[in-house]
């Protein structure tokens, strides 16, 4: 079996040790050569956009004078998770450029891959929490308590970060740099101690990391859409109102973007697990899964720099927060501005 992508790179043949082209199947050498040449540039572009975009989003959330809402607490944590994630991408770009010859030592092998793996879980768990929050506000509005929900949101985010760290522990522990004589490289690989670990990994990655969260996301968002249709997006002010409708539009877009970007990776990761337990075999499935994992990994990477774009173009409340922050930092913000004048300025700013 050839290599997996950066999220769970395990350069391997039947002994789970050799990177791409070290197996008997080598039907797509040109495709691999193209990937080694082009993907590092793509990864660095994702890193640059993700670093700037998520730093901007976090700055807006953290520097604003107003206290963060529940939705904004979750969104700020999602931006922080994406920011931590993209910090590991330059290491992986160099690794791909070197054809998986890891140049940074065993410690960074564990740290970079562990952080990337933790982000996989943290991101999707945060999307579940965001969806559940919108579900609570729109479907069961009377049960929500604003002050109490803020404390719950903060505690939920802390638990999500802890869960992501715990679920990525095997990556921190079992990742290591090993020589692969067939290719004359030292690869950063995942050394599973027993074949039964492949089943555990399948449960962890595909079930806990995608299918169960996906079921929850679909449940919450289907009920949200049904509730919006019933109400014609006219929610009584005590239960939500225009502010919640705008937040819901942003969150539904984020959820859709997340699923589109991450679903291909989990599909190919599932195929890779089937290969490891010998449920599928043959050169076609080997090449198809290996190349698919590489490409789907980078479609998942796109999500980390796409979220800030969604905030700006879909999140009207986020844009308003940006404007308020600009006014706050401007010397002219010290001068009093009437409420009607502020509304007029904001309306003109976002119409243009």
Curated annotation (Swiss-Prot):
A lipid is attached at residue 329 (S-palmitoyl cysteine). It is a multi-pass membrane protein. SUPFAM superfamilies: Family A G protein-coupled receptor-like. Residues 1-24 are annotated as: Disordered. GO terms for cellular component: external side of plasma membrane. Residues 64-72, 133-154, 226-246, 315-352 are cytoplasmic. Keywords: Cell membrane, Disulfide bond, G-protein coupled receptor, Glycoprotein, Lipoprotein, Membrane, Palmitate, Receptor, Transducer, Transmembrane, Transmembrane helix. GO terms for biological process: calcium-mediated signaling; cell chemotaxis; immune response; inflammatory response; positive regulation of cytosolic calcium ion concentration; response to mechanical stimulus. Residues 1-39, 98-110, 178-198, 272-290 are extracellular. InterPro entries: Brdyknn_1_rcpt, Brdyknn_rcpt, CCR1-9-like, GPCR_Rhodpsn, GPCR_Rhodpsn_7TM. The keyword Disulfide bond applies. The chain crosses the membrane at residues 40-63, 73-97, 111-132, 155-177, 199-225, 247-271, 291-314. Induction: In response to tissue injury. Disulfide bonds join 109-188. Glycans are attached at residues 13, 21, 184. Its main location: membrane. Belongs to the G-protein coupled receptor 1 family. Bradykinin receptor subfamily. BDKRB1 sub-subfamily. This is a receptor for bradykinin. Could be a factor in chronic pain and inflammation. PANTHER family: B2 BRADYKININ RECEPTOR, CELL ADHESION MOLECULE. This is B1 bradykinin receptor. It comes from Oryctolagus cuniculus (Rabbit).
């Amino acid at each position: 079996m050839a290599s997996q992508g950066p999220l769970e790179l395990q350069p391997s043949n039947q002994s789970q040790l050799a990177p791409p082209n070290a197996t008997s199947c080598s039907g797509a050498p040109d495709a691999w050569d193209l990937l080694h040449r082009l993907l590092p540039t793509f990864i660095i572009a994702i890193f640059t956009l993700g670093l700037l975009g998520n730093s901007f989003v976090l700055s807006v959330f953290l520097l604003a004078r107003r206290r963060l809402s529940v939705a904004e607490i979750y969104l700020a944590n999602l931006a922080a998770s994406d920011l931590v994630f993209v910090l590991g991408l330059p290491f992986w770009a160099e690794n791909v450029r070197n054809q998986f010859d890891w140049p940074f030592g065993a410690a960074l092998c564990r740290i970079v891959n562990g952080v990337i793996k933790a982000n996989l879980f943290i991101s999707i768990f945060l999307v579940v929490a965001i969806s559940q929050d919108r579900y609570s506000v729109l479907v069961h509005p009377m049960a929500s308590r604003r002050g109490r929900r803020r404390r719950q949101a903060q505690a939920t985010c802390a638990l999500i970060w802890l869960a992501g760290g715990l679920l990525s522990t095997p990556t921190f522990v079992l990742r290591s740099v090993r020589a692969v004589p067939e290719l004359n490289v030292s690869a950063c690989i995942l050394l599973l101690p027993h074949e039964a670990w492949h089943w555990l990994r399948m449960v962890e990655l595909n079930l806990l990391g995608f299918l169960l969260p996906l079921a929850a996301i679909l449940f919450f968002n289907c009920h949200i859409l049904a509730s919006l249709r019933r109400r014609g997006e006219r929610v009584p002010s005590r239960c939500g109102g225009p502010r919640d409708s705008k937040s819901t539009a942003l969150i539904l877009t984020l959820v859709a973007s997340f699923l589109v970007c991450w679903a291909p990776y989990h599909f190919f990761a599932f195929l890779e697990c089937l290969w490891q337990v010998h449920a599928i075999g043959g050169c076609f499935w080997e090449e198809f899964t290996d190349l698919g994992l590489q490409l789907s990994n980078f479609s998942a990477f796109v999500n980390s720099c796409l979220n800030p774009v969604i905030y700006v173009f879909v999140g009207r409340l986020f844009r308003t927060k940006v404007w308020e922050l600009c006014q706050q930092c401007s010397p002219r913000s010290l001068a009093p501005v009437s409420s009607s004048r502020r509304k007029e300025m904001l309306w003109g700013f976002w119409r243009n």
